[in-house]
Each structure stands twice: as structure tokens, then as C-alpha cells.
Amino acid sequence: MQIVKITYADGRTEETRLTPRALCQAEEHAQINNWAAGDASRIRQSYYLAFIAMRNAGHTTLGFDEWMDTVEDIALEQKDPEPANPTL
């Protein structure tokens, strides 16, 4: 599963899973706002995806611009799911 880890300007970190809902919302937002496709707006799209994932998970109630003012960095990571219990 993919997760996004946010490092805020105050030094704290938070992470959440990138859900299909967040991916679709970020894509739709980019299309509606005529952001350049692909690598031409990759950074903005990455930060917006992180914002949507955090908002959907209940980690922020701020708008995108206000949230961006609090962010130091984002990192996308791949985490393997917990292995299933073979005794179940």
C-alpha cells in the first residue's frame, strides 16, 4: 500500500494511506483547474494528492493554500501490508 508522510514546518510528522478516492479527487481537481498534464505540474499535483489524503483521513480542516503554508516536505512510500496470520 502507498502512504504519504507529511513533515510540517513545526517538526511534527503525520502519515496516511493514499486511497483510490484521494487519487481520483486529486486527478479531477487538476483537470477542472486546467493544471498542465504529467510532469509539467507534478510537484503541485503531488502536494495536492497529499493534502486530499490528509483531509479525507481527518488530519486537516484547512484549505489547500493554508495547509501548504504549514508543510515542510512530503514523501510517498510503499509499505507492505501486515502478513496474514496463517493460523486463522
Segments the model singles out, each with a brief description of its role:
Residues 1-13, 21-88:
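Charged interaction scaffolds used for protein-protein
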